[in-house]
Amino acid sequence: MKASNETKQKVISDLIKTAAGRAKLAASMVQPLRFRRDYTSIGRKTFLVEALPDGALPIYDKDPKATAYVVGEEGENILAIQKPKRVIFPLFEIASNPEIPLTQVKERRFDLIERAQDLAKSEIQAEEDGRVFEIMDAIAGAATDDGITNPDIPVVAPITPSVLADSYADIERHDLRVAKVFANAKDYSDIRKWGRDVLDIETQQTLLKTGLLAYLWGAQILVSRRVPVNHLYTCCEAEMFGRIPVRTELTVLSADDPKARTIGFSIFENIGIGAHNPAGLSRLVVAR
């Protein structure tokens, strides 16, 4: 739970009164030299996230007309489930176990313990997004022009508005609304060159940190390093595309090792990922 502004002000006031407190306050304000910003998950934006009650199983009734794609039980492979009336989205863990030598904690001018946790959480979110785009690739790779799924749209760079409009049309012909477009920064550079006449560019820093860079014809364009280069994914609304059942949300457990004099943490989440509507996805494959 986050502290209120009044509580924060009181803590700061108490720390300022002593030399040790001022040193601690100064250390908390120092930031390490970073290679890049911490990763923020964007894959969940195109799935309906559901917290599972204790004892509940991630079982869903499925339209027999559509094939469901799920991440396997160990999170290793993608399964295609076609005929059953019900489908279970297997749960799997994504974990990170940072370890910090106790001697390093005092040597750093920043909060090393908090930074280690932030990095671990960031990498877990990046790994989760990797599984999301693997599912999208599985759907697109099995797609045919059968009126239910949408075959890939080949594109010779640069990407043009007319090509992306065709991708929108593939989804909208199924009475679905396009809500998200996922791109790598290398491919988004083509879209950025369209200018403000086509693109409604977001400039707020808080939005940029979440991966949201622009709106196009009512849909959000989200950019991430986890999106494969030379691929763009156009997706329908979350409730019509898939589910992410969550048994255990991102959790931090203490895993210290006194004999090795290390401070450790076990950071993990237990989730499932499944897409039940292949018609809600269209993939552009770009040749450069």
Predicted regions and their residues:
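A short glycine/small-residue-enriched secondary-structure motif
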Residues: 89-100, 282
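Assembly/oligomerization interface modules of large self-assembling protein complexes
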Residues: 24-94
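Broad gene-expression machinery/nucleic-acid interaction feature
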Residues: 93-97, 178, 262
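Sequence/fold signature of self-assembling virion shell proteins
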Residues: 2-6, 10-13, 194-288
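Extended, solvent-exposed, turn-rich assembly/linker loops in the middle of proteins
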Residues: 140-212
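N-terminal alpha-helical "arm" segments
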Residues: 1-36
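Helix N-cap / beta->alpha transition motif
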Residues: 99-101, 181-187, 235-237, 277
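Alpha-helical scaffold segments that mediate packing/assembly in large oligomeric complexes
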Residues: 99-173, 286-287
